[in-house]
């Protein structure tokens, strides 16, 4: 014996009621210092007009040999420019984002010092942004900047940070700073050469 039970189909007047509940979203505030768990393996750098102008007006005009977007592989970060005090070496060159520079991969490039060109808003220049009013992006950039500072300190590489305001308004000051760091690089080079000589 078979029994058939007639199921009532919902109609316009007779709708099947379902209980709808809103899910509570436990949204935690954004923490710029905490990793999101995603590994950035193919991180790309961004090229700004400020970096192009700096390379053209300060580095190329003064005949400095540099790597553009020098990668510190152990922290997966890029420094804007790596300068060497060994210009007499014939380095393999490349063009990166319109900037002619030394190719980092496949050859030895002795770094005398590194340059970071920091925008006033994004890296929170005290002349532009008040310390207490930083947004999460600015806090994250400050954290990354401190990480880069520590990396340079651990590897005994001088780091020159140049603000956008100084590049646009105080070019003589910027040139003076670069020349001071070049002098440091040449002194370091002479000490290394002196150590290698037989005494």
How should these model regions be labeled?
Residues 3-199:
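Nucleic-acid endo/exonuclease domains
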């Amino acid at each position: 014996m078979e029994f058939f039970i007639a199921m009532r189909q919902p109609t316009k007047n007779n709708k099947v009621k379902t209980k709808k509940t809103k899910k509570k979203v436990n949204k935690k505030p954004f923490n710029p210092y905490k990793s999101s768990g995603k590994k950035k393996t193919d991180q790309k750098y961004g090229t700004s007009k400020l970096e192009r102008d700096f390379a053209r007006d300060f580095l190329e005009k003064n005949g400095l040999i540099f790597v553009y977007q020098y990668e510190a592989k152990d922290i997966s970060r890029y420094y804007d420019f790596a300068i060497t005090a060994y210009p007499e070496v014939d380095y393999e060159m490349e063009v990166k984002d319109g900037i002619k520079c030394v190719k980092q991969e496949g050859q030895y490039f002795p770094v005398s010092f590194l340059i970071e060109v920091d925008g006033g808003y994004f890296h929170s220049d005290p002349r532009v942004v008040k310390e207490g009013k930083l947004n999460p992006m600015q806090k994250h950039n400050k954290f990354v900047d401190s990480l880069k500072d520590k990396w340079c300190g651990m590897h005994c590489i001088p780091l020159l940070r140049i603000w956008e305001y100084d590049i646009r308004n105080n070019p003589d000051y910027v040139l003076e700073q670069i020349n001071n760091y070049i002098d440091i690089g040449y002194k370091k080079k002479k000490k290394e050469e002196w150590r290698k000589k037989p005494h």
